[in-house]
Amino acid sequence: MKESVYHKLEILVERYEEVQALLSDPSVIRDQNRFRALSKEYSDLEEVVKTFLSYQQAQQDVISAEEMLKDSDPDIREMAQEEYKEAKAQILTIEDEIQVLMLPKDPKDNNNVYLEVRAGTGGDEAAIFAGDLFRMYSRYAETKKWKVDVVTTNEGEHGGYKEIIANISGEGVFGQLKFESGVHRVQRVPETESQGRVHTSACTVAVMAEVPEAEAIEINSADLKVDTFRASGAGGQHVNKTDSAIRITHIPTGVVVECQDQRSQHKNRAKAMSVLAARLQQAEDEKRDAAEASERRNLVGSGDRSERIRTYNYPQGRITDHRINLTLYRLNEVVAGDLSCIVEPLMQEHQADLLAAMGDE
């Protein structure tokens, strides 16, 4: 292990012990905001510190084994040789673990998200596929015990959605869904196809981190055009009697957000503003990421909405993620919500990208 990394880890251990002491300080316990912040810091430090302590223990085991190798008793030397090998192997394993734990964290990984699924090329079939994708993400969210709240929908004429936006909240949502942004392509025989021909359709998925109010970028009210209109679709008679739906246009960027799924105009406006903040933040992030990508191109994680990232081939039961050349014949399981077999390899590839970048520095 590099001396500089070892020194950083020693500093983290000191801070961990300091935070541990602060958490039992009565004045800190009384200050709930500070107590919460320190509890989070303690939790964030815990894994890397405990792993480093295991590393130090393995180092001590190597030293002890080396001492025992000098013993005159051949049985003790044989046992020491075994312990030496085990401790050395453990050091290498723990070094790899520490390397991953020391990777820069995306501060947004624990944020909730706005998931936006839009039908692209393919007409009715694209809208039906958008419905399938939304159902896939909803079921995956269920397995993760995340909460899904629909913000707005524009239903397709023959099922599915021309567009659907939902808020997904829970632990680590953005970190696990951020690689879903891009173009998802489907190849299958539509139900309306009498000749049995395979059609290709596409949908665009955007995953935007929800911006906490305290961190939201400032939106000037003078830059907004707000329209109210009567909500359509589900919600009973009530929604059609009042102009409760909201459309907000951000004039400088041309970004338009509609929300009509809440009962009151006030709630629809609040939701629409939250989606707008997420979209504007996403645009800022994309601009920054594009500048960084010109220096170093990541295979995964560009989040480019125009990038074709995945193909769902129904006749062959095949799903392919083009960014990491991953092909699985588990299409039915994936669209039923078992996304982990794709999410985990994408996260591992992203980690490998970050490790490679650290090696270049």
Curated annotation (Swiss-Prot):
Location, primary (coarse class): cytoplasm
The UniProt record lists the keyword Protein biosynthesis: yes
PTM summary: Methylated by PrmC. Methylation increases the termination efficiency of RF1.
One Pfam family hit: RF-1
Keyword Iron-sulfur listed: no
Assigned keywords, A-Z: Cytoplasm, Methylation, Protein biosynthesis
Role description: Peptide chain release factor 1 directs the termination of translation in response to the peptide chain termination codons UAG and UAA.
Compartments, as annotated in UniProt: Cytoplasm
Organism: Pseudoalteromonas translucida (strain TAC 125)
Entry GO terms, CC: cytoplasm
Family membership: Belongs to the prokaryotic/mitochondrial release factor family.
PANTHER family documented for this protein: LD18447P
Protein name: Peptide chain release factor 1
Modified residues (N5-methylglutamine): 237
Gene3D superfamilies associated with the record: 3.30.160.20, 3.30.70.1660, 6.10.140.1950
GO MF annotation: an example: translation release factor activity, codon specific
Domain of life: Bacteria
Region span, Disordered: 286-305
